[in-house]
Amino acid sequence: MPISCKSQCGNRAVLKRPKTGDALCKECFFAAFEAEIHHTISSSNLFRLGEKVAVAASGGKDSTVLAHVLKLLNERHNYGLELVLLSIDEGITGYRDDSLETVKQNRDDYQMPLKILSYEELYGWTMDRIVAQIGRSNNCTFCGVFRRQALDRGAKLLGVDSIATGHNADDIAETVLMNVLRGDTARLRRCTSIRTGGGEDTIPRVKPLKYSYEKEIVMYAHYKKLVYFSTECVFAPNAYRGHARAFLKDLEKVRPSVIMDIIYSGEQLRFKDTVKKPERGTCIRCGFVSSQQPCKACVLLEGLNRGLPKLGIGKKSKGERMIAKQDQELALRERAHLVKNDF
């Protein structure tokens, strides 16, 4: 027997919402999904009239749905935003080169200007070359650090007021779990924040999809027939996040509300005053936001350029010893060369 839509619109239900368990027709699901995102935006005051907003676009389901919904809500509710797409090309053959074609399709479909920045032009390296140097054990560290700074660089170049990212509820719950498991109180403090950054020298980042389930984002993209790139990064299987994701999926089978439960728990966490909070400033080398001197991106880049790819991995003191050792070896070689030339 057909199930009727719970909203009593008279239509037949075609799906069951993972977030609420409600049986809905397509149109009522669209309305509920979009209304929840609008509520998140308006209740958190994510945007102001007349702002220029960069949508971090990867071509995946999250950023594609984010671009689609922001354009729709901007017109429906008169946000008065100027929306642009900002995409980062990490230089991953067979992955990013293909996904950028989807981003270009998004540009045409949503009539938004698109800016693409590459690791090659920003840092002189691609992820393919970095992985060839470092191997697959720490590649996500390099990519994550460089990507975060690349978005800041792109946002500054475009002169935007904020960056909207496609982080969804599952992503945030995974991050809470990761930071708990690692004992990373600094990141645990801010990982559930819907807005981060925005200080004197930083461009804020906002998460309009913070309370949107990944499964519902996939459903929305499917029923709306949105074009998105679904292939996983070829280097992603080795990421630590994958273990947190698998753990979260197991918990969700037992308790469907666990995603929102973890997010709410993260929001309510309080830390003792004695817990040290890292001070954020600007890097003495590149001038971008950092909680250390020099910033992580500059340290990692120095390691690559010195032929010491593991320089920025692990404790700072270890990296300093690696630099000192290399400098000493270079000095000895130079001295030996000078002595040889004297004869």
From Swiss-Prot:
Question: What's the top EC group for this one?
Answer: transferase
UniProt key word tRNA-binding: yes
**Lineage top rank: taxon:** Eukaryota
Q: Which GO terms describe its molecular function?
A: nucleotidyltransferase activity; tRNA binding
Q: Name one GO cellular component term.
A: cytosolic tRNA wobble base thiouridylase complex
- What keywords would UniProt list here? Cytoplasm, RNA-binding, Transferase, tRNA processing, tRNA-binding
What SUPFAM superfamilies does the record point to?
A: Adenine nucleotide alpha hydrolases-like
| Gene3D superfamilies reported in the protein's UniProt record | HUPs (3.40.50.620)
- EC numbers listed for it are 2.7.7.-
Pathway participation: tRNA modification; 5-methoxycarbonylmethyl-2-thiouridine-tRNA biosynthesis
Q: Where in the cell is it found?
A: Cytoplasm
Which InterPro entries does the annotation name? Answer: CTU1-like_ATP-bd, CTU1_C, Ncs6/Tuc1/Ctu1, Rossmann-like_a/b/a_fold, TilS/TtcA_N, tRNA_thiolation_TtcA_Ctu1, TtuA-like_LIM_N, UPF0021_CS
**Which family does the similarity line name?**
Belongs to the TtcA family. CTU1/NCS6/ATPBD3 subfamily.
Summary of the function given for this chain in its UniProt record: Plays a central role in 2-thiolation of mcm(5)S(2)U at tRNA wobble positions of tRNA(Lys), tRNA(Glu) and tRNA(Gln). Directly binds tRNAs and probably acts by catalyzing adenylation of tRNAs, an intermediate required for 2-thiolation. It is unclear whether it acts as a sulfurtransferase that transfers sulfur from thiocarboxylated URM1 onto the uridine of tRNAs at wobble position.
| Name of the featured protein | Cytoplasmic tRNA 2-thiolation protein 1
* Originating organism: Drosophila yakuba
